[in-house]
Design a protein with these regions (language model features):
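Beta-rich carbohydrate-recognition and catalytic domains
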Residues: 1-152
């Protein structure tokens, strides 16, 4: 069904968050069923790995979504990197019910993994408010960079 563009049958694939290591590519992504449309059931990050972008190994949901009462009812985009201690994911948690209750609907979150496949979420939301000029309802999709010179 797919070549180069990974798409499981019957699923909308969105927000690809790639990570590569030693010729292996981790293709983290969102799977939206669009059921009911246009914004379907809550989702986490799914994972497929590949070495050639033709053949894939599908792991299904790798970073699990939260409950309907948690900040990460949906797990929106983010980024993955690796340190000596393992993998880190910084991502956006979104809850579509929070705005109605007067809560912040999007928050930055963190998870760790030993293998890049199974993730453990940190318990605390990150206290990183949007800078002046950014929409507080659309503060999301963190991307982490390593500064070689400063080693941070």
């Amino acid at each position: 069904m797919y070549q180069l563009y990974y798409q499981p049958e019957g699923i909308w694939v969105g927000d690809i968050m790639p990570y590569g290591k030693e010729g292996q590519f981790y293709v983290y992504h969102q799977r939206d069923t669009r059921n009911p449309g246009p914004f379907g059931e809550p989702f986490g990050w799914a994972l497929a790995t590949t070495k050639d972008f033709v053949d894939y190994k599908d792991y299904g949901e790798s970073l699990m979504r939260g409950t309907d009462e948690e900040a990460d009812q949906f797990i929106y985009a983010g980024s993955v990197f690796e340190t000596e201690a393992g993998f880190h994911a910084f991502y956006t948690g979104y809850n579509r019910e929070f705005l109605k209750a007067g809560k912040t609907s999007q928050t930055l979150l963190h998870a760790t993994s030993k293998d890049g496949i199974t993730w453990e979420k940190s318990k605390e939301a990150l206290e990183i408010p949007p800078q002046e000029g950014y929409d507080k309802r659309n503060w999301r999709d963190p991307f982490v960079l390593w500064d070689e010179e400063r080693e941070e």
